[in-house]
């Protein structure tokens, strides 16, 4: 299942590379693709290849742990 998300990096201490690495290692996302960067808003559009819907719950946990804002597209 592919899910696009927009991640706001304003309030996070991690870089987009660190976020992608965490998603792929800690949370079993097979493939994280950075589709676009919106410089004005400091946001990234990511395409996540998730194994199943349960990963969406884990995504919420990671977002909470990293203290980032995420929007589903």
Give the residues covered by each predicted segment.
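Short glycine-/aliphatic-rich beta-strand segments at the starts of folded cytosolic domains
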Residues: 1-11, 44-46
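Weak global preference for isoleucine
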Residues: 6, 16, 62, 68-70
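A structural detector for beta-sheet-dominated domains
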Residues: 8-10, 35, 49-51, 71-73
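Short amphipathic alpha-helix segments
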Residues: 10-31, 59
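Generic preference for flexible, low-structure residues
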Residues: 21-23, 39, 62-64, 72
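Conserved short beta-strand edge segments in small beta-sheet-based binding/regulatory domains
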Residues: 29-34, 64-73
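Charge-rich, low-aromatic oligomerization/scaffolding segments with amphipathic character
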Residues: 54-66
């Amino acid at each position: 299942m592919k899910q696009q998300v927009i991640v706001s990096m304003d309030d996070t201490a991690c870089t987009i590379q660190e976020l992608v690495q965490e998603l792929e290692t800690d949370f079993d996302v097979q493939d994280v693709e950075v589709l676009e960067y919106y410089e004005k808003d400091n946001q990234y559009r990511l395409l996540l290849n998730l194994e199943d819907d349960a990963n969406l719950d884990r995504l919420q946990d990671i977002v909470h742990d990293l203290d980032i804002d995420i929007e589903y597209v």
